[in-house]
Curated annotation (Swiss-Prot):
UniProt gene name: trpC
Family: Belongs to the TrpC family.
GO BP of this protein: L-tryptophan biosynthetic process
Pathway annotation: Amino-acid biosynthesis; L-tryptophan biosynthesis; L-tryptophan from chorismate: step 4/5
Keywords, in A-Z order: Amino-acid biosynthesis, Aromatic amino acid biosynthesis, Decarboxylase, Lyase, Tryptophan biosynthesis
PANTHER family tied to this protein: INDOLE-3-GLYCEROL-PHOSPHATE SYNTHASE, TRYPTOPHAN BIOSYNTHESIS PROTEIN
Catalysis performed (reactions): 1-(2-carboxyphenylamino)-1-deoxy-D-ribulose 5-phosphate + H(+) = (1S,2R)-1-C-(indol-3-yl)glycerol 3-phosphate + CO2 + H2O
Name listed for the protein in its UniProt record: Indole-3-glycerol phosphate synthase
GO MF term list: indole-3-glycerol-phosphate synthase activity; phosphoribosylanthranilate isomerase activity
Superkingdom in the source lineage: Bacteria
Residues spanning the membrane: none
Lineage: Bacteria, Pseudomonadati, Pseudomonadota, Alphaproteobacteria, Hyphomicrobiales
Length: 265
């Protein structure tokens, strides 16, 4: 496991323990049961594909460990509306505070502002976080294969499916992909950022895409800035993309989203 993930796991496990003390599992489960039903995340992406469009998972991200503050003018509700107006299929909302200045409150606000399904983008180590995600309205969660062993990944995926949520399995190399393909989720994301070096290259997606079965929904993540980047990944069979930083830096987010999704005539 990379140094960055080791540090993140340490503070995450402290966060989880504190959350359990403040709000025991039974209490958060009761809230999750009363939450509005999950909006189909995979379903929304497949609907875009059926219409001949790219499926964009548009990310609401204030900051990152590698780039620092990304957007000072940060209004999750307004950003969600801009993404929806720009043609995004789904939202991804960072809820990790120490590294990304995220918050579960941002997830609640963003989802309430639109009809799009939302992913809780965070580092998941415990099924408690899955229930917590659903209690705050999340329709999908992220499993980072580099952060978990096979048993942990299965437990977290099972917990999400039990709550009617979708799961994005994130991989960065062939061994992680092999492990992810043993799980049930149809959605496999290839992170073009190496979590050990933070180097980003679209060649990662190009190398792994041919290894992903055609019945899986492939997602390209990180390093995607232009329509040319989307076209490059589309050539290896990807039609779903998770994009955050490049859109977060734009003054007119809706227009930037539309421009990114515009296919060459």
């Amino acid at each position: 496991m990379s140094d960055i993930l080791t540090k993140i796991e340490a503070y995450k496990r402290e966060e989880i323990a504190a959350a359990k003390r403040e709000r025991p599992l039974a209490a958060i489960e009761a809230i999750a049961r009363e939450a509005s039903p999950p909006r189909g995340f995979v379903k929304a992406l497949r609907a875009k594909h059926a219409a001949g469009d790219y499926g964009l998972i548009a990310e609401i991200k204030k900051a990152s460990p590698s780039k620092g503050l990304i957007r000072a003018d940060f209004d999750p509700s307004a950003l969600a509306r801009a993404y929806e107006a720009g043609g995004a299929a789904c939202l991804s909302v960072l809820t990790d505070t120490p590294s990304f200045q995220g918050s579960l409150d941002y997830l609640v606000a963003a989802r309430a502002a639109v009809s799009l399904p939302a992913l809780r983008k965070d580092f998941m180590y415990d099924t408690y976080q899955v229930v917590e995600a659903r209690a705050h309205g999340a329709d999908c969660i992220l499993i980072i294969m580099a952060a978990l062993d096979d048993a942990e990944a299965k437990d977290i995926e099972d917990a999400a499916f039990d709550l009617g949520m979708d799961v994005l399995l994130e991989v960065h190399d062939a061994p992680e992909l092999e492990r992810a393909l043993k799980l049930r989720s149809p959605m496999v994301g290839v992170n073009n950022r190496n979590l050990r070096t933070f180097e980003v290259t679209l060649a990662t997606s190009e190398a792994l895409a041919p290894l992903i079965p055609k019945d899986r929904l492939m997602v390209g993540e990180s390093g995607i800035f232009t329509p040319a980047d989307l076209a490059r990944l589309a050539r290896v069979g990807m039609s779903t993309f998770l994009v955050g930083e490049s859109l977060m830096r734009q003054q007119d987010v809706a227009a930037a989203t539309r421009a990114l999704l515009a296919r060459a005539a």
